[in-house]
Curated annotation (Swiss-Prot):
SUPFAM superfamilies, alphabetized: PLP-dependent transferases (SSF53383)
Family matches, as PANTHER family: GLYCINE DEHYDROGENASE (DECARBOXYLATING), MITOCHONDRIAL, GLYCINE DEHYDROGENASE, DECARBOXYLATING
Cofactor field: pyridoxal 5'-phosphate
InterPro entries: Aminotrans_V_dom, GcvPB, GDC-P_C, GDC_P, PyrdxlP-dep_Trfase, PyrdxlP-dep_Trfase_major, PyrdxlP-dep_Trfase_small
Binding partners and assembly: The glycine cleavage system is composed of four proteins: P, T, L and H. In this organism, the P 'protein' is a heterodimer of two subunits.
Organism: Legionella pneumophila (strain Paris)
Swiss-Prot/TrEMBL keywords: Oxidoreductase, Pyridoxal phosphate
Family per record: Belongs to the GcvP family. C-terminal subunit subfamily.
Single annotated GO MF: pyridoxal phosphate binding
E.C. number(s) listed in UniProt: 1.4.4.2
Annotated protein name in UniProt: Probable glycine dehydrogenase (decarboxylating) subunit 2
GO biological process, one term: glycine decarboxylation via glycine cleavage system
Length: 484
């Protein structure tokens, strides 16, 4: 039920209505509302009940096991949120003077240094407001670097066929042509194809390591040498940093620039389209091109660096300092765990993934790459289940919802047929993993004996299978368009 269906003329929550509304605003008259907004007329109790019930119908990290591959749905520690909400942080105005913001600036400066140490890259900018924007910033810096050298013939970005969809999107937005590199049968990049396609037009290559196949790219040093010898740069998509945190640094692997997804590796909140934060880290040669602002330290304290400090900067990507509240959460998460704790993150993440992969193969599931160990995530292929029992990966995913488990990522990467990409983050216990295995075993038995149960799933949720194509092509967000 939509909240408009609860509406009744004259009903209102008076406690929430301001006694007087000031009209001393500077909105031009042509932009001022001429009629009252068409809001639902509901009591406060109705509103509270409605949205509380909606929240109870959602799947979330706080309520359900959430093995969504390539998303690192780890628990967000409440103490971190509390620390980031200290009055000195949340009451600071974005335009406050540097000398009135020394504590805030010092915190961000330390965060820059922590990220530099974690990534093995000397330059860090915190300003991008999402992983995708950080990715765009990284590719834009690659372009600025080549242009500053007069190397304008480099108009190609190499991208593996198993890459995240944002990779080619960022490359195209920066004016590059995307050149796809195939994956070899063992899950690594096809080096022979890379050798054929890298050349004088190569601006760079975008990689995730471990890849979205859940496999560590074993020839990364050779790849780095090939691209660098051709004059290109290496971009690291930080989506899977959780798998190698504290073990190996992207800078040490030969990468020149990367973005970090704070909502994945560093436990800031997911969802809702934001707020997000996607800091970028760069090697020495790209420091001049970093997006502003960044925090610098001088004898007089901490200050915002300006265009005078970075005249070749690609510019600003956001107002002020990006999403400061999210950056603070990542900083306190690092403080809470410390160096040893961050190392344990990757150890437990990879342990969980390999344990779960082993247990699921014991109950009949097929690993997409049975000869390889998982990193922090892995892929099951349900191709045989589809051929033998006419049930799909989507059927398995929908049935999991009936058992109170959020579905893994389905049909991604596209090169693995009928796949589930499963990522059990380090915050999940062995008991939770064992419970998931038991559910998966039950669902597979249902697929064999009663496949129609899977085909009609979910059975217990208020919403069944939606028409995704219709929703995408016939966007309807106006209640009154169909109810008048």
């Amino acid at each position: 039920m939509l909240i408009f269906e609860l509406s009744k003329t004259g009903r209102q929550a008076k406690a929430q209505i301001p006694r007087a509304v000031s009209k001393n605003y500077s909105i031009p008259e042509e932009f001022q509302r001429k009629s009252p907004p068409r809001l639902p007329a509901c009591s406060e109790l109705q509103v509270v009940r409605h949205f509380t019930c909606l929240s109870q119908k959602n799947f979330s990290i706080d309520t359900n096991f959430y093995p969504l591959g390539s998303c690192t749905m780890k628990y967000n520690p409440r103490g971190v949120h509390k620390a980031a909400s200290l009055p000195g942080f949340i009451n600071r105005h974005p335009l406050a003077m540097d000398n009135e913001s020394q504590g805030f600036l010092e915190t961000l400066y330390k965060l820059q240094n922590y990220i530099s140490e974690i990534t093995g890259m000397p330059g860090v900018s915190l300003t991008p407001m999402a992983g995708s924007q950080g990715e765009f910033a990284g590719v834009a810096m690659i372009k600025a670097y080549h242009q500053s050298r007069g190397d304008t013939a480099r108009d190609e970005i190499l991208i593996p066929d198993a890459a995240h969809g944002t990779n080619p999107a960022s490359a195209v937005m920066c004016g590059f042509k995307v050149v796809e590199i195939a994956t070899a049968p063992d899950g690594d990049i096809d080096l022979d194809e890379l050798k054929r396609k890298v050349g004088p037009r190569t601006a760079g290559i975008m990689l995730t390591n471990p890849s979205t196949l859940g496999l560590f790219m074993r020839q990364i040093k050779e790849i780095a040498n090939l691209v660098h010898q051709a004059g290109g740069l290496l971009y690291y998509d930080g989506a899977n940093l959780n798998a190698i945190l504290g073990k190996v640094r992207p800078g040490d692997m030969g990468f020149d620039v990367m973005h970090l997804n704070l909502h994945k590796t560093f436990a800031t909140p997911h969802g809702g389209g934001g707020p997000g934060a996607g800091p970028v880290a760069v090697g020495k040669r790209l420091i001049p091109y970093m997006p502003l602002p960044v925090v610098k330290k001088t004898d007089s304290g901490y200050h915002w660096a300006t265009r005078q400090d970075y005249p070749q900067s690609i510019g600003r990507l956001s107002c002020f300092m990006g999403n400061a509240g999210i950056l603070l959460r990542a900083y306190f998460y690092m403080l809470v765990l410390g160096k040893e704790g961050l190392l344990r993150v990757s150890e437990f993440a990879t342990l969980n993934a390999n344990y779960l992969l082993k247990e699921l193969t014991k109950v009949g599931y097929t690993a997409a790459y049975p000869g390889r160990r998982a990193s922090h995530e892995f892929i099951l292929t349900l191709n045989s289940e589809k051929k033998n029992y006419d049930v799909t990966a989507m059927d398995f995913a929908k049935r999991l919802l009936d058992y109170g488990v959020h579905a893994p990522t389905t049909y991604f990467p596209l090169l693995v047929p009928e796949c589930l990409l499963i990522e059990p983050p380090e915050t999940e216990s062995k008991e939770e993993l064992d419970a998931f295995v038991a559910v998966m075993k039950t669902i597979r038995e249902e697929a064999i004996k009663q496949p129609d149960i899977l085909k009609a799933a979910p059975h217990t949720l208020p919403v069944k299978r939606l028409d995704d194509v219709k929703a995408a092509r016939e966007l309807d967000l106006n209640y009154f368009a169909t109810h008048e």
